[in-house]
């Protein structure tokens, strides 16, 4: 996930890139949190994902959403290279969330990790839309257009 976001970051503008850099740093906290089961009493407890990190994502979602036109249809992945890379990062994030859910079936997992990954995928969608707001249009789904 972090590497995929890194690729998107190389293609993104400065605003989006700054947000992605912060996310990449926090993803190391996510990894550290997952390495030490919730039930462990460890010095690593300072590396747990906390609600404030989720709140920071939500604040960034709000900031970028305010700049965008409201959606009138589902968005197809694509548009600018940065947007396409962000859509790809979003799908990797969703897969990561599913894997953490599977892990939670067998061991204690900090629920904030799951909340963080869920909100991160939403933010990556918003950032993909923002990346297309620089002169590229979002590619909108047209029902039935793909029918032969």
Regions found by a protein language model. Give the residues of each.
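Phosphate/pyrophosphate-binding loop motifs in nucleotide- or prenyl diphosphate-using proteins
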Residues: 2-148
């Amino acid at each position: 996930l972090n590497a995929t976001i890194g690729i998107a970051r190389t293609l993104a503008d400065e605003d989006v890139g700054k947000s992605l850099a912060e996310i990449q740093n926090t993803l190391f906290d996510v990894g550290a949190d997952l390495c030490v089961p919730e039930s462990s009493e460890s010095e690593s407890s300072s590396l747990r994902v906390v609600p404030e990190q989720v709140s920071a994502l939500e604040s960034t979602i709000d900031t970028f959403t305010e700049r965008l036109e409201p959606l009138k249809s589902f968005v197809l992945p694509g548009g600018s290279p940065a947007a396409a890379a962000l859509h790809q990062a979003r799908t990797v994030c969703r897969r990561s969330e599913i894997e953490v859910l599977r892990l939670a079936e067998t061991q204690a997992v900090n629920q904030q990790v799951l909340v963080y990954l869920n909100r991160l995928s939403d933010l990556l969608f918003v950032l993909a839309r923002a990346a297309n707001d620089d002169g590229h249009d979002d590619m909108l789904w047209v029902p039935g257009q793909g029918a032969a």
